[in-house]
């Protein structure tokens, strides 16, 4: 079935129906195959796209820039040091200015209200590259990766997320898992579960219509049993003060994804997902600082798991580009 998503914004997962999300994922798979085969046809020639980054990025920025280039579009990168956005010019005014100059706008920053205001006033498609509440473009990449690494239909897939489940990734996985009909489990301390009113209750309501199973548990054995995929994220998100590290380590060290966690699934074919960057070794300044204070050589995932055959994190990272390209083509293409 074809869908017309032209001129639609994507600021949170619920902007689209489950069928529309699956259309985007399928389109991404087709665009990926075309890129590999050398048969990709540009559909965004002459388009101009603004990339607003109030938060730093490697994967998201590169994914948008390469996807746009592949499709013939031009991008303009705007960061806080190079624009007046939110400082000397309101978001509403910025949206109306950029909407006159650009064909679409990507926003990555703290405030969900900001990306929603951009979408309300710009008059062109606006895409959420990440906010503190939601990470919708990551979900497209995650579920393309899941579909590439299982022979099961999604309704038979079990995904267990370990760690801080109240962050943007936990929110998005809970809702998207419900929308796409999987068995999605948030395995985390109770104080780090997603917000009941904003995330958990809507996800349960969606699950009643899609056949999904949505579980919140602090019981690691229960949460991991039979899982096809284990997913984790950093324990301290961008924008949080560094002082919270010690408390978060105390809360989440039992929820580290390690060899024992993989074994607890009882599934020899279990796969590991992470949206990256990951603190799996001492290769970063932050990790070395934490090691000096705590003696830990890894945080949310051990190096053993990260570098194991179970790890599909770099397939997942690549798929950011293919799925973002699908979003751009579907909402902006000719």
Curated annotation (Swiss-Prot):
Major location category of this protein: cytoplasm
Keyword Amino-acid biosynthesis recorded: yes
Pathway recorded for this protein: Amino-acid biosynthesis; L-arginine biosynthesis; L-arginine from L-ornithine and carbamoyl phosphate: step 1/3
Keyword Nucleotidyltransferase listed: no
Top-level taxonomic group: Bacteria
UniProt-annotated binding residues for L-ornithine: 168, 233, 237-238
Matching NCBIfam families: orni_carb_tr, PRK00779.1, PRK04284.1
Function text: Reversibly catalyzes the transfer of the carbamoyl group from carbamoyl phosphate (CP) to the N(epsilon) atom of ornithine (ORN) to produce L-citrulline.
Name recorded for this polypeptide: Ornithine carbamoyltransferase
Organism name: Thermobifida fusca (strain YX)
